[in-house]
Amino acid sequence: MRLIAGPCQHESLVHSHNIAKTLTDLCNELGVEFYYKASFDKANRTSLSGKRGVGFHDTLLDFRAIKESIPDLKILTDVHEIWHINNIAVDFDDAVDVIQIPAFLCRQTDLIKAACDTNKIVNIKKGQFLAPWDVAGILSKTENAKEVWITERGTSFGYNTLVNDFTGVQYMLDNYPNVDVVFDATHSVQKPGGNGTSSGGNRAYVPTLARAAAAVGVSNFFMETHPEPDGAPSDGPNMVALDDMRSIIQQLLDIEKVIK
């Protein structure tokens, strides 16, 4: 099993290091492959008042320091513009292992091709507006990629609501055998714009959806987590408390044993 986990946005060196170390130790104990995730800039905000993050340069410097402190740690971060990708490739090649394309940018051809021209794994979030079979069009743009992941993060279902279609997840598992299908259990419970000037969500449903994905055969999971989710600068309502991660991971491992 693979886990991609961390806070919504990078807040500080100490904050990210502590989360990454906690999750590294937990995953090593449970035999789970781990990638730490955090964003340097939350460019897609519900309103102008939304907190965006520490910024590209300072965050990437912190990523480098965290990787130096935690042996073999792998880090994923999302990009929004081609210059982000170019700067990672030139100046911060050692700080990032996976480049993520956000869901709302999943059809941006030049952005995808630029990410795939690096020697990085590319994780593409499947847009909330996209059918599972339409992912084939995205994958046609990734021929130069070292490795590609596709992440399911829910489908728009009316105003401020997302749902998960697990037949669609099964479709991607069956029809894209050369791609790792990832299930994002925390953004799947998001209510986009549901709190007026910010997005809402309900983290209580995260374990349920993650278990359902595991039962379908997913073995790659994306979850945002935070020591104090309700005090997080973004996506707090759908982030899992760090102390609850062990229980969720163990449940997924138990299901994986049963279906195999």
Language-model regions, residue ranges each:
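A short alpha/beta connector and helix-capping loop motif
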Residues: 16-20, 85-104, 109-117, 192-227
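Glycine-rich anion/phosphate-binding loops
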Residues: 10-25, 54-61, 200-208
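Alpha-helix-loop-beta-strand connector modules within alpha/beta enzyme cores
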Residues: 22-30, 51-76, 115-121, 169-181, ...
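Short beta-strand segments at enzyme active-site cores
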Residues: 32-39, 74-79, 183-185, 219-228
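Active-site-adjacent loop and "lid" segments of alpha/beta metabolic enzymes
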Residues: 48-57, 75, 100-105, 159-166, ...
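Glycine-rich, proline-tolerant flexible connector loops at the mouths of alpha/beta enzymes
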Residues: 3-13, 34-56, 225-235
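Catalytic beta/alpha-barrel core
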Residues: 54-55, 70-85, 96-110, 120-132, ...
